[in-house]
Amino acid sequence: MDDGDILTLGNTSIRFVHTPGHTKGTISFFYDVKENEKTYRVGMFGGAGVNTMFKTAFDFDGCREAYLASVELLKKEKVDVFIGNHTWNNDTYGKSLKLLNGENNAFIDDKIWGAFLEHCEKRLADVIAEDP
């Protein structure tokens, strides 16, 4: 998939965004879902990890700058449902338990996306401070 490509599966159209940094080819994606007659935007940052930002692990020169540019690009996306690369990114397990207990859909949270992206920026700043 390339930046801006859209893949349609049934009634769902997934938009892909090239977000290099973690690796050169990192892709993030966005699509809409409906629940109770309401439409929500789902988003996933395909390369949130900063482990490749240490100089000994650089995937490519300029990866730190590319990562920050990707985070800035992703901040412009409106996301109601954030899907993490790993379950700890968005407390998948805890939110699933809430659903099983009949609570409101904890996955719908339009604030977690921005908070997670800010967390990604801080993690990179920590890496740069440790490994300038």
Enumerate the language-model features and the residues they cover:
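C-terminal regulatory/interaction regions
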Residues: 104-132
